[in-house]
Curated annotation (Swiss-Prot):
This is 23S rRNA (uracil(747)-C(5))-methyltransferase RlmC. The lineage of its organism: Bacteria, Pseudomonadati, Pseudomonadota, Gammaproteobacteria, Enterobacterales. It comes from Salmonella dublin (strain CT_02021853). The gene is rlmC. It is an enzyme of class 2 (transferase). Coiled coil: none annotated. It holds the Pfam family tRNA_U5-meth_tr. The active site is at 334 (nucleophile). One of its GO terms (biological process) is rRNA base methylation. HAMAP family: 23SrRNA_methyltr_RlmC. Its EC number is 2.1.1.189.
């Protein structure tokens, strides 16, 4: 992939950009083999790749500059701003949004936050696009509610320019730290969730719910999990760290009993909405801590699917799963190192199948799906 920002030395986020996609995939595969060394794997499935560019469905932009000439991108360690509007990871549909937002910021009087001076209001712009219908969600991350009235007053102009903006919010992040969002979310539109659809499964994206940033590869990840589960005798399943329910909603059948657990209430609201649309009455999603939920249960499901954050599921949950001993475990991980550590804490399981998904091209990161079977 050619990137003018990288060539000019202005951005180094894509550290592997000088390697071909095939070289990147080979290096990631070798890394996964290294991490799972000593753990016998019955079947290595071929890795799954995706688009080289324009694949990312989300932009997280630091806003700097002035209210008359705002700049969207990032700040170097020394505070130097870099405009990332031309990043080739973004789809072409983002460009007109960025172009319209620059004069809008002046209209609304949203002074960019100055980190050095600790002054200003607008900290970040967070933009998400649905590949299903092209609808977008825009979040203004503000230091306070001071400019809310001005923001609301200026919105009709922005919505006339960008009718694809379905969900617009103001997130309040008052802390002088590099934190992307605060707890308070103020909706500025009637619609509060963005409609998405993978493999004919309806999904919803709300402001504070995690959603994969590479929809092409994510849809194949979910479809693969559905295929694997469909080959197993599963009547009762847990989906832990379930997010908006992507895995569970793909894997569930009308006959299956499935419980999805996720600590973020916004994500659970999305999952419940999808389950209702699908008419799956035996799906139950709850906003709880996954480890606390699992260790408090007296019943053993046929299959436990886990999709934890980078830190992994941790030894307490590993120990409980080893003791509870469901027949199958599917582990989806964005950090194969912690996944390998967790699997080593499950000595009564064998690895039946492993597949790598290149969710994060041009970086060392990748997603991996692993099927474990009880010995």
């Amino acid at each position: 992939m050619q990137c003018a920002l990288y060539d000019a030395g202005r951005c180094r986020s894509c550290q592997w950009i000088t390697q071909s996609v095939n070289e990147q995939l080979s290096a990631k595969t070798a890394d996964l083999h290294r991490l799972l060394a000593g753990l016998p794997v019955e079947q290595w499935c071929s890795p799954i790749g995706g688009p080289e560019q324009h694949f990312r469905n989300k932009a997280k932009m630091v806003v700097s500059g002035s209210v008359e000439k705002p700049l969207f991108g990032m700040l170097h360690r020394d505070g130097t701003p870099v405009d990332l509007c031309g990043c080739p990871l973004y789809p072409a549909s983002f460009a007109p949004v960025f172009s319209a937002l620059k004069p809008f910021i002046a209209r609304a009087g949203l002074t960019p936050y100055n980190v050095a001076r600790k002054r200003g209001e607008l900290k970040y712009l967070l933009l998400t696009e649905s590949q299903f219908d092209g609808g977008m969600m825009l979040r203004f991350v503000l230091r306070s509610e001071t400019k809310l009235t001005q923001l609301r007053a200026a919105l009709p102009w922005l919505r006339a320019q960008l009718p694809q903006l379905r969900v617009i919010t103001a997130n309040i992040q008052p802390v002088h730290m590099a934190i992307m969002e605060g707890e308070t979310e103020i909706y500025l539109t009637d619609q509060q969730a963005l409609a998405e659809r993978f493999n004919d499964v309806p999904l919803w994206i709300r402001p504070q719910s995690f959603f994969q940033t590479n929809p092409t590869v994510a849809s194949r990840l979910y479809a693969t999990a559905r295929d694997w589960v469909g080959q197993l005798p599963v009547r009762h399943m847990w989906d832990l760290f379930c997010g908006v329910g992507g895995f569970g909603l793909h894997c569930a059948t009308p006959q299956m009993q499935l419980t999805g657990i996720e600590i973020a209430p916004e994500a659970i609201a999305c999952a419940k909405q999808s389950a209702a649309e699908l008419g799956l009455t035996r799906l139950h999603f709850q906003a709880l801590d996954s480890t606390q939920f699992a260790t408090a249960q007296g019943e053993t499901p046929d299959l436990v699917l886990v999709n934890p954050p980078r830190r992994g599921i941790g030894k307490p949950l590993c120990d409980y799963l080893a003791q509870m001993a469901p027949r199958f475990i599917i582990y989806s991980s964005c950090n194969a190192q912690t996944m390998a550590q967790d699997i080593r804490h499950l000595p009564n399981y064998r690895i039946q199948r492993v597949q790598l998904f290149d969710m994060f091209p041009h970086t060392a990161h990748y997603e991996v799906l692993t099927l474990l079977c009880r010995l």
